[in-house]
């Protein structure tokens, strides 16, 4: 009799713990990924992350933990390609793990520059040869893909003109562009923002444009996210806030072998650059102290 009572009490505790865990899951959870050379946190992705959090009280967010590096000493000298590969794995791990804990929570992905590249890789698959990712499978589980309702990518080097989810004026491509004809199975969930003067997602030379997408397209991004989420959100109770950021840079993938010239749109110079300083096509133009590009 006493044993049965103890058994029932134990079962009740287990059920209660499960109920508490389920109740602690938010209706909406946002993952944000920062750009290259910015310290841990959301970086410029924070603008859109905060817009969503303010629009949906009770929603939660977390930053993807990854190097966000491009060979600079300030971030450990990790190459851009290796950083993007680690970041892609980090997105898959974080999103899959969260979805396993909270299967009914709607997920939104927000990635800026290199952060956009790793979100794109994780959601769309297709591999990323420049980052050493040869497996073309989507690294998110089927359940996690279903839970992801919207993805906002800004200034992503994977941008290529002509994709149905593109937004902006760029008619070219980024330095790590998707191959022509690529089809993302979750394309209807994506908005990919890129304007023509951007030197990283496009072929321009204006760093300020690369850093300005949150201010230019933030409200449009929020409108898109609202259209994709199942539950309506009340208007923001406080004005959206934008965390302070330091101007980052997003250099391209591993330098070409010394002795050869960089290809069109490739890197040809910059502080700490040890690769080619000539261009097989175009002219080497400096965008900033870290990055010169063949244009």
UniProtKB/Swiss-Prot annotation:
Keyword RNA-binding: no
GO terms for MF: carboxylic ester hydrolase activity; cellulose binding
Signal peptide: 1-17
GO cellular component, one term: extracellular region
Chief localization: secreted
Record-annotated active site: 113, 198, 210
Composition skew (Pro residues), residue ranges: 236-258
Gene3D superfamilies for this protein: alpha/beta hydrolase
Paired cysteines (S-S): 25-102, 184-202
Compartment(s) of residence: Secreted
Effect of substituting residue 198 to A: Loss of enzymatic activity and attenuates virulence
Mutation effect (residue 113 to A): Loss of enzymatic activity and attenuates virulence
Catalytic activity: cutin + H2O = cutin monomers
Residue ranges, annotated region (Disordered): 228-258
Secreted listed as a keyword: yes
Family per record: Belongs to the cutinase family.
Protein name: Cutinase 11
Species the sequence originates in: Verticillium dahliae
């Amino acid at each position: 009799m006493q044993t049965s009572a103890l058994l029932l009490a134990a079962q009740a505790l287990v059920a209660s713990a499960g109920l508490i865990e389920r109740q602690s899951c938010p209706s909406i959870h946002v993952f944000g990924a920062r750009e290259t050379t910015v310290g841990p946190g959301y970086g410029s992705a924070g603008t859109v992350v905060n817009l969503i959090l303010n629009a949906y009280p009770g929603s939660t967010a977390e930053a993807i933990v990854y190097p966000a590096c491009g060979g600079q000493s300030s971030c450990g000298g990790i190459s851009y390609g290796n950083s993007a590969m680690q970041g892609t794995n980090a997105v898959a791990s974080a999103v899959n793990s969260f979805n396993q804990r909270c299967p009914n929570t709607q997920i939104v992905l927000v990635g800026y520059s290199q952060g956009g590249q790793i979100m794109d890789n994780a959601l769309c698959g297709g591999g990323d040869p420049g980052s050493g990712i040869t497996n073309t499978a989507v690294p998110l589980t089927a359940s996690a893909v279903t839970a992801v309702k919207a993805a906002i990518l800004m200034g992503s080097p994977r941008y290529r003109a002509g994709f149905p989810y593109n937004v902006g004026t760029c008619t070219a491509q980024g330095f790590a562009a998707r191959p022509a004809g690529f089809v993302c199975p979750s394309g209807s969930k994506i908005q990919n923002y890129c304007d023509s003067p951007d030197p990283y997602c496009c072929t321009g030379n204006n760093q300020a444009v690369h850093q300005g997408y949150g201010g230019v397209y933030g409200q449009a991004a929020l409108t898109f996210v609202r259209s994709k989420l199942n539950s309506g959100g009340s208007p923001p109770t406080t004005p959206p806030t934008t965390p302070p950021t330091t101007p980052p840079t997003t250099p391209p993938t591993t330098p070409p072998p010394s002795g050869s010239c960089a290809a069109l749109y490739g890197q040809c110079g910059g502080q700490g650059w040890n690769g080619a300083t000539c261009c097989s096509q175009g002219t080497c133009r400096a965008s900033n102290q870290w990055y010169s590009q063949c244009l």
